[in-house]
Structures are given as structure tokens and as C-alpha cells.
Amino acid sequence: MKILILILLMSPFVASSERMNEECSNVELYFKSPQDGFKSKAKEFKVEFGSKNILISPAGVKVEKVKECFVSGHHHLIINGAYDVLDNKKQPIPYGKNILHFGGGQTEANLSLPPGRYSLQLALGDYEHRPVAKIDYNELVISEIINIEIMP
């Protein structure tokens, strides 16, 4: 009987923990546009960033955590694998020609690229440009890599 009572008392905590882990795993960063395989004859094109369960906030502004899985930050666009956030999990994402920062909290941008093939990936950075993790540094908030081509 004591075991049954203990199980009944603990079950809300187990359900709450499962729900929290589910919410944490639903954090997502992705490209609304362009889509993987995009081809264009125009050098300039619009890139739209998508996010799920993320508060997009400007760089330099520390947002207080309001719950365990609260995730906030701003977008970084990495072109042609110019930087690997997975290899530099605790380092600020640097600035560079192919590492674009959207520290104002922007969710879209117009890019101009010369003809060629490109890979694009989004990474979420915190107020100090460090990569943001879902729960711990085992899983960073990054998008899938997409491939595009700007035609001559």
C-alpha cells in the first residue's frame, strides 16, 4: 500500500518532467525561405528565418529565463561552413565574411551572392553571441544545412 501511495504521489512529477523534456525538444531553427535546392538567376534574394519555441531577442540584451526550457537569442547565418558551432560550443560565434550576425533580432535579410553553389545554416546565439543549447551543450539550436545555387 505504501508503494502505491508513493507511486501516486510521484506520478505528477514524472508527467511534468516528461512534458518539460518534450517542450525542450520542440525548439527549432529553420529556413522559411529559400528552401533546400533553391536556384536563382538573380544575385539578390530574400532569406527568411523561422523558429519554434524561441524568443528572438537582440544581441547585448540578456533575457531572464522564465521557465526551464526557455530559449532566447538572435540569428547567425553561416555560409559554406565558414564556422562550425558544434566544434566551438562555448565560444562566441565570430564575425566574418561568411558568418553574418543579425544582432538586432532580425528574422529576414536580403542576401547578394555571386554565381555559385552555397550551403546555408542558421545558428542561434545568445546575448554574447555564444551558441544556444536546448537543455545542455549536447544539442545546440542550429538549423539543417540547405544548399542553394546562384546561376550565372
Model-identified regions with their sequence ranges:
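Sec-dependent N-terminal signal peptides
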Residues: I3-P12
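Boundary at the C-terminal end of the N-terminal hydrophobic targeting segment
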Residues: A15-S17
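Short, compositionally biased P/S/T/A/G/V-rich stretches that sit at domain boundaries
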Residues: R19-F45, G50-I54, P152
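Beta-strand-connecting loops/turns
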Residues: G37, P115-G116
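Short, solvent-exposed loop/turn elements at domain surfaces
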Residues: S40-A42, I56-G60, V85-D87
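Generic short beta-strand segments
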Residues: F49-L55, A123-E128
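Short amphipathic, basic-aromatic surface patches that mediate peripheral association
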Residues: G50-K67
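Extended, well-structured beta-strand/loop surface patches
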Residues: K65-P115, Q121-I150
